[in-house]
Amino acid sequence: MTDLAAEVEATRCQARLFALAERDHARGLVEVRGSDAGRWLDGMVTNETIALSPGGGCYAALLTPKGRIVADLHVLAREDGYWLDTSAWAVPNLLQRLERYIVADDVKLTDRTADFGRFSLEGPEATSLLGVP
């Protein structure tokens, strides 16, 4: 069996971890922190985010005042704030639009795109390896 055939078989029958190159999976990550982060973010995106527990998440969008989509994103709640997972190309515009609405709020936005790598665990045994029921 060739190396490629063995990798395909392992993925099909068990699980395999893939490193996702930036060019293959261009995702961006924005960190939202501060004592007002939950309330502020809840008013900025289309889904209810303030009720999210750490480790939870939801799909949402950032809209213009006229209702046009600026970016679609996944909001991931953390103990100390939120992560906004979106397309890498959307991050500069997302940051620019969000920053204009931080007036007297204790909110800090940080582009964390370059700080993390992306991996994908694939195969029928993936969830059991992660301890997910």
Predicted regions and their residues:
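Basic, glycine/lysine-rich polyanion-binding surfaces/domains
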Residues: M1-P133
